[in-house]
Design a protein with these regions (language model features):
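Glycine-rich phosphate/adenosyl-contacting loop at the front of the ribokinase-like
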Residues: 1-58, 63-67, 74, 229-230, ...
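Gly/Ala-rich phosphate-binding loop of Rossmann-like dinucleotide-binding domains
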Residues: 47-48, 151, 248
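Conserved phosphate-binding/catalytic region of the ribokinase-like
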Residues: 166, 194-290
Length: 290
């Protein structure tokens, strides 16, 4: 079982010719909604590949929240531990697209209602996990409580440190793997809590160049296949979900990274954060064709 503890957002996306000036109203050319949030994105990526996935998080007791839970169930994800809250709305991301650029306002909403006490009540679900995957779009004290129980139960953890925040003192020892991008990795290694011995906990994503990690003192690079990219939005989340899935299947770190890099590469060939996330059959076909 893969347990994902993280965010669930509804993306509200508008397209205009240019960004409005303060106080100005513009007529947009397109509006659409999509399911997002790093936590849910990564859960979907793992489930599409055939993983047994449960989601832990919060949504509002509102139409967005109800719609999201229905969608996740259709993706085969267990949502019994996603808590609807009545006093706060489902998390949203307001995205304006103009001339190839974007402007984004994230309203965490219900995502910040997942508290350490909730994790304590759900520790039985954590104990059944093969691996636990987290991000930093929820409260830090909640993430810390998940790490506490994971360490107590001897369960491997993956922390995707995005959006970036410095890793608090004491966390490094509890985390199995961190999956920063290049910029996040640079900041992590300059932080006061980083030690050289933690280098082998880092699996660094390099965008279209693939990924790199260190094992037994060696730097190991995993190159990415060349693809025609349509939308890179969900590549990082696909990588994390795939990594968790293949590690839970018992693959070595190197093999799991190789599969995750290929899954992320394939995901960018279709639009949408979740739209391009491949199934296991699609990924196998893609890799065999290489």
């Amino acid at each position: 079982m893969i347990t994902v503890v993280g965010s669930l957002n509804i993306d509200l996306i508008s397209t205009v010719d240019r960004f409005p000036k303060p106080g100005e109203t513009l007529i947009g050319s397109e509006f659409r909604t999509s399911f997002g949030g790093k936590g849910a994105n990564q859960a979907v990526a793992a489930a599409r590949l055939g993983g047994s996935v449960q989601m832990i998080g919060c949504v509002g007791d509102d139409p967005f929240g109800h719609e999201y839970l229905t969608y996740l169930k259709k993706e085969g994800i267990l949502v019994d531990r996603v808590k609807p809250v009545t006093h706060v709305s489902t998390g949203t991301a307001l995205i304006v697209l103009a001339q190839g650029e974007n402007s984004i306002i994230v309203v965490p909403g219900a995502n910040f209602q997942l508290a350490p006490e909730d994790i304590d009540r759900m520790k039985d679900a954590l104990e059944k996990s093969d691996i636990i995957l987290m991000q930093l779009e929820t409260r830090l004290d909640t993430v810390e409580r998940v790490l506490f129980w994971a360490e107590r139960f001897g369960i491997r953890t993956i922390l995707n440190p995005a959006p970036f925040q410095p890793i608090p003192d004491g966390w490094w020892e509890m985390i199995t793997y961190l999956t920063p991008n290049e910029h996040e990795a640079e900041a992590l290694m300059k932080s006061a809590t980083f030690k050289e011995e933690f280098l082998e906990k880092l699996i660094i994503t390099l965008g279209k160049k693939g990924a790199v990690y260190h094992e037994k003192g060696r730097k190991i690079e995993i190159p990415a296949p060349q693809v025609d990219a349509a939308d890179t939005t969900g590549a990082g989340d696909t990588f994390n979900g795939a990594l968790a899935h293949f590690l839970s299947e018992g693959l070595s770190l190197g093999e799991a990274c190789r599969y995750a890099v290929h899954a992320a590469s394939l995901s960018v060939t279709k639009p949408g954060a979740q739209g391009g996330m491949p199934t296991r059959a699609q990924l196998e076909s893609f890799m065999n064709g290489r």
